[in-house]
Amino acid sequence: MEVKIEQSWKNALAGEFEKPYFASLVRFLHNEKASGKKIFPPGSQIFRAFDLTPLDQVKVVILGQDPYHGPGQAHGLSFSVPDNIPAPPSLKNIFKEIESDLGVRMSGYPNLEKWARQGVLLLNAVLTVRSGEAASHSKIGWEEFTDAVIRYVSDNCEGVVFMLWGNFARSKRDLIDRQRHYVLEAAHPSPLARGAFFGCRHFSRANDILSSIGRQPVDWQL
């Protein structure tokens, strides 16, 4: 199956695109559109995380659950929204933690493309959603695909820092070879977690790890 995705990922994931579950997933999305359902993000942005962070550049993975389901919010990067959209509550809490952890001022600019271009794979486990219906595209095949992505990174890259926030993301830890990679776990940054995310210091810890293995730290300031 021909999938429009960055070439290094296309090569790495070619086997997934030929599996029955992926054909079923594509059929489901076509049927959603044919029946007039509004799907986020727009089709050209579904694989945006991969387009901005080629496989050989991955040094951090931040795993989200599914895209924002409000108009104009989702643009293919976990936790991120486009420039003209107010930062959602979880992203505001991420920025607060960065300010506390790194002693920098965050502008509140909500588009995380700068991170993606530095090797931070902003991966949602589910890559599409129906407008206004959270988790409406869970269990249609995306989880199988993104589990394969995590497994591929684990098996074929070295020294990647995985940030797993909340129980859903943490459930993916067994896909990761912790002899080769670094797994940082914390509560979810959502306000529903009652502040348990604060103090995790994942951003300084990730940079310390990257520096210690000779990789360029991430400039987290926006």
Where are these regions (language model features)?
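Generic N-terminal amphipathic, Lys/Arg-enriched alpha-helix
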Residues: 1-13
